Swiss-Prot record:
GO cellular component, one term: cytosol
Name of the featured protein: Phosphoglycerate kinase
Binding site for ATP: E330, G355, G356, H357, T358
InterPro entries per the UniProt record, alphabetical: Phosphoglycerate_kinase, Phosphoglycerate_kinase_CS, Phosphoglycerate_kinase_N, Phosphoglycerate_kinase_sf
UniProt entry tagged with the keyword Kinase: yes
Assigned protein family: Belongs to the phosphoglycerate kinase family.
Gene3D superfamilies, per database record: Phosphoglycerate kinase, N-terminal domain
Amino acid sequence: MNFGTLADIETRGKTVLVRVDFNSPIDPSSNTILDDKRFREHIPTLQALEDARVVVLAHQSRPGKKDFTTLAAHADKLERLMNMPVTYVDDIFGTCAKHAVRDAHPGDIVLLENVRFSAEENLTMKPEDGAKTHLVRKLASMADLFVYDAFGTAHRSQPTITGLSYAMKTVAGLLMEKEVSMLSRVFTSAPKPVTFVLGGTKVDDSIAVAGNVLANKTADKVAIIGVVANVFYLAKGIDIGEPSRNLIHMLGYDDEVAKAKTILDSYPDKVLLPEYVAVKEHDERKEYPITRVPKDCPILDMGTESIVQFSKALRNSGSIVFNGPAGVFEEAKFASGTFELLRAAANVDFSVCGGGHTAAVIEQLGLEPQYSHLSTGGGACIEFLTGKKLPAIAALEESWKKFGN
């Protein structure tokens, strides 16, 4: 990754645009931010820019959603976390925004309005086209430098994500730098053996990751859990029962069965599948071998014998990349697979979690300090692990070529 970082630039007295990802769960009735984790992740970058005029760019949700709102509550939250005043401007690039930025002093933080209030920001476009938008040209004219720190949106190509990097000198913020460094380590220097644990309901993403890390020999083993495992069972010709089969169809993953079969045929010794599962039968947890699942009972977790087997395999790993739960952990009866595997994964030398629900469970279990890295970007992390270059990373590299030293 050949892009600039904060260590490569002088920021004292400069006006610096910083793109963050403050997109958070919000209670629409009270406009209260329910989780400030994403704010906390960006604090080190903002603190590192204490000698500059900092102009923060962020979004909240998207048009049409109930939580698509102004960033007034975000300014209050940031003010409390930074323990300093934050100037909120309900404007993105108009006269009010320009005046607020012009009047700021080094050490000040200005938070502009939700960038998705600008129609241009909601369009996917090439970076060179993004650089020509009114949004980017107006923002770039207000500042000397751009710091991109929003890993959670790095898999998108929209004006403030990739266009600004083509319009002005841009470097990665501390969070972005950390994410790329830790996730790159999975491919370059992770202690062996490396086990990927792929679960949850995003079957297409998990199968793409499995195919990539097995083909390039990044993974020594791939443990398949959750709904992803159900697709692999179908690929083996196993009857998983009507409810689980219907769920795969409803989620639109029928075509993934053939891809799962290709992986099983190509890497028969490298794919781990639970042999025992837990189903909901008469509202109770009942465990069966996968070949004897009752026809009308949904599979909601791994069985105890498989939890023990998988936990042992994880503890014998040097590195683990964990993405997605083993079952419906929101129901206490079906949480043990997810909880126990996450506990086992916490004990290895190098452990990475792909973000999203899994990261939330790790925090809930108090395991966060034991993990090497919890990614802040679910979709971006997955796309990175499939081997694709994220648009924001490509734009950072292009900016450094164009404007860097």
